[in-house]
From Swiss-Prot:
Keyword Transmembrane helix annotated: no
Family: Belongs to the asfivirus MGF 505 family.
Function: Plays a role in virus cell tropism, and may be required for efficient virus replication in macrophages.
The keyword Acetylation belongs to this UniProt entry's keyword annotation: no
UniProt name for this protein: Protein MGF 505-3R
Induction notes from the record: Expressed in the early phase of the viral replicative cycle.
Keywords tagged on the record: Early protein
Domain of life: Viruses
Pfam family, one: DUF249
Lineage, opening ranks: Viruses, Varidnaviria, Bamfordvirae, Nucleocytoviricota, Pokkesviricetes
Length: 280
């Protein structure tokens, strides 16, 4: 069969029901047979049938690329599959000829990183963008929950205060709580109080509570009294009228009297009403 006729069949036939008498040989001639998988048919924009079983087209593309099956990759791309999945599949199986061919369709490794679950593949993908530094890798590891990458480079990060502080604050901003705890506990952070600024700004009560646990553990391990610091944060959230944060600070040892005094001063009636009803 001529290549032009095959191309026409690959484009037009998949949107129709394939005749039952089309055996593997005919499908191979039409370019609609996937070795070891079976017949291919497009049924929707994002769905195909593989041997009559539905599968998302991008998942099929990832598998085809992981097998190094150039013909099927090209077919699925012509059906509007996302080329990022071709790069991921090829990276996982180390088909670097396919990686570089289809990476040109994407151009930026950072657009591919959210699709990757494996830390080794994640790092290999990031290396495709030559100008990027290790600091950039660490930053995206935080954003995409790739803690194993930070663990791998602990020796490199140890003592790099500026980078560790940046990663810590990024983890706080992105609500990556496991990262927050690990970075503070393993790498060490000079300015933990930035956590509270971010938590209050983003109204993130979980992060705010986590910050208190970190601060209390730090100060108690050094034999220090946390009361002054707790009341410092309490004043901040009381002035802003943030009742859930006020209550959380009191729970950890902040002064209820300070909260009531500031609520009166700044006329936060909802806070006053809460305490007047005797709930705390």
């Amino acid at each position: 069969m001529s290549s032009s006729l095959q191309e026409l069949c690959r484009k037009k036939l998949p949107d129709c029901i394939l005749p039952e008498f089309f055996d593997d040989y005919v499908l191979q001639l039409l370019g609609l047979h996937w070795q070891d998988h079976g017949s291919l048919q497009r049924i929707e924009k994002n769905q195909i049938l593989v041997q009559q079983e539905p599968i998302h087209i991008n998942e099929a593309l990832k598998v085809a690329a992981s097998e190094g099956n150039y013909e099927i990759v090209e077919l699925l791309l012509s059906w509007e599959a996302d080329p990022r999945y071709a790069v991921v599949g090829a990276l996982e199986s180390k088909y670097y000829d396919l990686v570089y061919k289809y990476y040109d369709l994407v151009k930026d490794c950072h657009d591919i990183l959210p699709l990757i679950q494996n830390p080794e593949t994640f790092e290999k993908c990031h290396e495709l963008n030559n100008p990027c530094s290790l600091k950039c890798l660490f930053k995206h590891a935080v954003i995409h929950d790739m803690l194993p990458i930070l663990q791998k480079y602990t020796y490199f990060l140890d003592g790099w205060e500026y980078c560790n502080q940046m990663l810590f604050e990024l983890a706080c901003s992105k609500k990556k709580y496991e990262m927050v705890v690990w970075i503070e506990g393993v790498l060490g952070i000079g300015k933990v109080t930035s956590l509270f600024t971010i938590a209050i700004s983003n109204r993130d009560l979980h992060l705010y509570s986590l910050g208190h646990l970190i601060i209390l553990e730090r100060m108690q391990s050094c034999g220090q009294d946390p009361t002054f610091l707790l009341n410092h944060f309490l004043r901040d959230v009381s002035i802003k009228g943030l009742l859930p944060f006020v209550l959380k600070t009191i729970e950890y040892g902040g002064s209820k009297e300070i909260a009531i005094t500031l609520a009166k001063k700044y006329q936060h009636k909802h806070i006053l009403k809460y305490f007047e009803t005797g709930k705390c």
